Amino acid sequence: MATQADDAAASQANIEDGDLKEHVHDELDKIQQQRSTATVFPEPLRESDSEDSDDEDNGPAQAPPMFMNMNQSIYGLIAQASNRVDFNDRFDGMSSDEEGESSQNTRTESIARTSILQPAGKGKDKVHRRRKLSEHKLLRSLPALPKLRSRHKSQHSTLPAPEEVADEADDEHGDGGLLPAPALTLTRQDTQDRLAPVMSRMLEAKADLSIRPSFDLDRLSSDVSRSSDSDEVSALSRKLKEIFEFDEYEQVIEEYPCWLLQSVLLQGYMYITSKHICFYAYLPKKTHEAVKSGYLSKSGKRNPSYARFWFRLKGDVLTYYKTATDVYFPHGQIDLRYGISASIVDTDKEALHFVVETRHRTYKFKADSAPSAKEWVKSLQRVIFRSHNDGDSVKISLPIKNVMDIEDTQMISFADTCKIRVIDNDETYAIDEYFFSFFSFGKEAINVLKILIEDSSGARSAEQVITGDDHDSSQPSSGHASKAASKRAPSKLSTGKLPDTVKATLAPMSPLSPRSPSQLSPRASMDAPRSSFDGFRRFGKKSLDVTSSIGDHSPRRSFSGRRSTSHQHRQGTTTPKQAHDSEDSFLQSSIENPSISTLSPSSYDEPSASQILQGSDVFHSPMMRRSASTSRKRDRSGKRTPRSSSAHGDRHHGIPHAATTGAIHKMGDEQADSQRPATPTLNSITKIGAYPLQRANAFAEYLSRTSQRMGSMFATESLGYVEKVHGMWKGEHRHYDEPQELRTDDDGEDIDSEADDKMQTTIDRFRAHFALPESEKLVATYFGAIFKVLPLYGKFYISDRSFCFRSLYPGTRTKLILPLKDIENVHKEKGFRYGYYGLTVVIRGHEELFFEFRKPGLRDDCAVTLHQLMETNRFLEQSGILDQEEQDDEEAAAAMAERDELQEARQDEFVDHELTLPRTTSGVSNAPTILFDNPNSSGLAFKPQKSMKITCLTIGSRGDIQPYIALCKGLLAEGHKPRIATHGEFQEWVESHGIEFARVEGDPGELMRLCIENGTFTWAFLREANSTFRGWLDDLLDSAYTACEGSELLIESPSAMAGIHIAEKLEIPYFRAFTMPWTRTRAYPHAFIMPEHKMGGAFNYMTYVMFDNIFWKATAYQVNRWRNKTLGLPSTSLEKMQPNKVPFLYNFSPSVVAPPLDFSDWIRVTGYWFLNEGGGDWKPPQELQDFIAKARADGKKIVYVGFGSIIVKDPAKMTQEVIDAVLKADVRCILSKGWSDRISPKDDPSKPPPDEPVIPAEIHVITSAPHDWLFSQIDAAAHHGGSGTTGASLRAGIPTIIRPFFGDQFFFSTRVEDLGVGVCVRKWGTNSFGRALWEVTRNERMIVKARVLGEQIRSESGVDNAIQCIYRDLEYAKSLIKRRAGKNNAEHGLAEDDDDTEESWTFVGRDEPDPDAVTKKLSDGLAGLGAAGDRPPPLGSQAPTVA
């Protein structure tokens, strides 16, 4: 044995002097040699000799340790102590790592030696053991003291250095059978001063003895640190020190790609250094994007039946809705920050059912298929895993001295897995288990870890760590010993000190998803399960937001990077101040044995009596205050000063929380607090006598405070309830954004604190109601009603980022969560009910919402608050100031940069370790969910292999033709052969761009006159068109078919009416494209049926149903006749054509007309198709350039006024009104008089035209000019509101005035007003037009909005997007035309009601009639369109009345 000990000591010395990395590689080589030359012993020789050795080596000591001067009084010790002695510093024992740093030149002498008898035969054995602390009578007589903390190396005491414990016993005492006790030594300089009392020196020796793990182990860490300072530090070592916040540079021994195995499999890298085992993985959070969405069935809380909802997994919240379009009205929410697990139900053979367990309840779901259920479970597991991690990267740092053992486990069949059991810290001695899987280098990595643990100076068995038993420290720790030690009673906790704690951003969890609450214990600690771990651990900014009395008390340690510190202390996260919030240490009574029940007081959902009374000072353990100045105080902003990890650990009656996976704090005062020793000093022990007086004072204070609270409670409890109900029905409001920093009255601190507590309660309830993050700041609350079918009374919440509503009627659960960024505008209108005041909120891509208030002041205050917050958010976005989402993006970018730097440093040092992905997991049904960096996925190529002959069919004015010219030029660039089929007057313009032209009959001017005079598709329009336009429609259909022959793809404006039939005849794919909404939606009304006021989603949807039926019924007879005679196709109907399933391309910007949420996947909003004609050969006239230059020199605003080729009754009058308005508004005008070029047929052509007004010098008249050039030279534009002209002015970033005449012009004028970038002039006149000119040229708010919108539109590429959409939906369009061709080739004897392919529409909402019923009624009631009757007013000027 002695020879073995000598060899071990020599080997350890060689490790210290040499390189640790080389030693590990040498040990690996020995293992390989042993494997190759291993001797197989026969069966009788395989038994262990452990029993004999135990009987021989581990005999009991002959005598217990002896102490001197046991009769000395403690008060005598105090009297003998010098005033200059600081007992706090004197009893702060140094760690074993510090002993080697003392000066070697200082002579020391032995003060006292205590001999310990040893059994015979052990005299020459140099392997010494620690004595059992339970045998020391002095320590057994003292209370259960907290563990001793080591002081940081940088802290130097002003007193002489304390006595050091000798590392090795003197050899001359070996023969006598006595083992020399640790020698208490002092320097010669110290002996000149007065010595400390004997008991003081003895207690110091005991403290140092408890710190040292073993006397025969050398100080590897200190040697490494000294060598690392002298040698050159590698880039990887520097980066690891920065990321994991080491105290010093550490030598990197090995690096391996590995996977952290928990409920998911996380890709990362393991870094093995001289002192730590580190794991790093880049895991970005996806807070602002929807991860998965789809339909699921959910079981109710009390109703076991399943109901079908549409689910969306976004951020940390799983939200479900009644329909996929009501994304602002959630039916329910599941906050996955409280999530524990997600798993498939084992008893389900079909694997359709799965459950999600949270701290509150268990949710049951049913998917449509087994793959869908599996995908949902994996997505939920990923989100739960991410939500439990702090930051955008996973960091785990395991000190090697804390590692108990490393065990090979077979968790998954396709990788090597090891289990690392590590002691969390020296406060609770909780044992964590971490599982790491290796798909490559697995055996090598596990061997390196085992070698490093066995050779480390901190290698101790679990029994030594927990109980301090006297076992041979040279024995390697085994799994059997660890398991036996873990079952030890916690009453044997020693005062030993671990040099470091486990630090992690992620909690250690079981590698298997728990199936029941009894299996939720992630680690085995002592002898009791720790089932409360997952539910109550604190995880930083995305952590479990448990009650303040539980979640905030956990001394969990996390990496103190920029992410964790920036989100832990936000506004509104404070808790009521308690006495134990200060930096006071607590001393347990000697009769109180620590147990697991006290370590985890939050293990149960129902609070115990001690938890209820935790706010009382009476029920706390005795408190030892360092000084009055160290107490923490609450600052005026409602935040608390950051506390050190020890302060966190001392909460809950001095017992730290069970979950204590350690934290890293920045160096400074916080570290000084955390490094203070937990072992009570002699100075502190003297204060024990004052505890009864402190308890009495605290009890008296408690009685006084409680009596006052109870008295006020009885007096105000019932009154407060009445006031709440009265305030709710009275409809009051409250603002919560008053800065607390303005309060300067210190006398009112208690009043302010009480008000702040009430305010904080309201804010917490607001966040809990809507599952919002802690960063959401409540601004104001109101009471009012949301108006859907019936008014629903409730409470409005306005935060800095959301507008929320919650119904208060019993039996209702309506909620609204509307992000402020989705609100386009807010309008004040009349209420639907008498005596109420309305507020309309216009939402991007959604129908407008209506609200009502009892008082106009409340309505106005709510509108102003919303406008202010909307403007603030827009200003922050424009100015570049980071909002919350951008802050998260910046943190994610920082984490990505950190990952890249670490990868670069890793590749420089370990180039042979490349990551090997588990390629066989796809075939394993129960393989864990895999998380890894998202690679850059390349998109699929949808472009056809050969060029196509594409025809664009359209009719209308110049603005209707121009977008198709732009699209055809893009198709030409793609190699296709485009053709435009339209009116003959545009032939020269089309061919000038190199595009083939095909003629379509029809006069666009005649059609425009019909629309202006009768309104767009009104009863008068249909009656006149039915009588006079029969021949016009026949010519249009025949010429359109001729123009489209030979085409391989047809793109048509739906106003041409012939395209869908031609595509059916030619059996070619068919697309629709238009400049205004033509597809059924609740977001916008039909562009041809625009009301004067907002009418809601039900009305909007019904306008499309009405128009489709009227439009088809008016043309059905001629169309079916043309199909039969010309095309040879059978007659059709609106239901058989299914026009709403045709792929659609909208050529307007999504920034102007946001895609509605209820659009199908084949409906695309591509962006404007601009035809840039100003950048070619066109040159502006010199007169125009001079006019613009003179206006700029005079400091005048320049506006453009042009209403295109609109036909007006009195062109001269309109010109004079424009002149007068320009002069009144004091602006310069560029006038394009296109309205005088066309003459109304009602006027006599033989009459001479009226005299034109005299044009003043402030106005310059032009014939035409490219919009892309002209609009960039002016300040505002006024036009008729066509799609192309509106897009041109908005792209230039200038405010727009729209004077609508017919068609889609009313729609775009409404959109311009809703966006706040222009003015709509519905009632024309000199004064109204002049006021509009004044506003658009001087309203800075409107000017800024227009400029921002212009930047967004200019960044789009509408033509390129449209071409890609054509490629993407081409196969879908072919499938539709094949289906129609198959039906036409079938026998004509099919039943008329054959609905195999009939379109099935889900009508969104419950507040509108069935569209199918309306379609049939309209079809039956429109038989006599040509009947005589009074002509109704145009629908473009007023809202129609719908029965």
Curated annotation (Swiss-Prot):
Q: Segment Disordered: which positions?
A: 1-69, 88-187, 463-657, 1385-1443
Q: For this chain's UniProt record, which GO biological process terms are given? A: autophagy; carbohydrate metabolic process; lipid glycosylation; protein transport; sterol metabolic process
Q: What is this protein called?
A: Sterol 3-beta-glucosyltransferase ATG26
Residue ranges annotated for the PH domain, each copy included: 289-385
Q: Which residues form a coiled coil?
A: 883-910
Gene Ontology cellular component? phagophore assembly site membrane
Where do Polar residues bias regions lie? 104-117, 585-614
From start to end residue, where is composition biased (Low complexity)? Answer: 1-13, 506-525
Instruction: Give the observed phenotype of the deletion mutant.
Output: Does not significantly decrease the growth rate under nutrient-rich conditions.
- Composition bias, kind Acidic residues: at what positions? 49-58, 164-173
Instruction: Please list the residue ranges that the record marks as compositionally biased, kind Basic residues.
Output: 125-134, 631-642
Q: Which family does it belong to?
A: Belongs to the glycosyltransferase 28 family.
* EC category: transferase
The record's gene field reads: ATG26
Q: What is known about what this protein does?
A: Sterol glycosyltransferase responsible for the glycosylation of ergosterol to form ergosterol-glucoside.
Ranges of residues in domain GRAM: 240-284, 765-870
Highest taxon in the source lineage: Eukaryota
Give the originating organism: Gibberella zeae (strain ATCC MYA-4620 / CBS 123657 / FGSC 9075 / NRRL 31084 / PH-1)
Basic and acidic residues: which segments have biased composition?
18-32, 1405-1419
> How would you describe this protein's topology in the membrane?
Peripheral membrane protein
Q: Which Cys residues form disulphide pairs?
A: none
Return the EC number: 2.4.1.-, 2.4.1.173
> Does Protein transport count among this protein's keywords?
yes
Give me the reactions it catalyses: a sterol + UDP-alpha-D-glucose = a sterol 3-beta-D-glucoside + UDP + H(+); ergosterol + UDP-alpha-D-glucose = ergosteryl 3-beta-D-glucoside + UDP + H(+)
**Pfam families (UniProt xref):** EryCIII-like_C, Glyco_transf_28, GRAM, PH
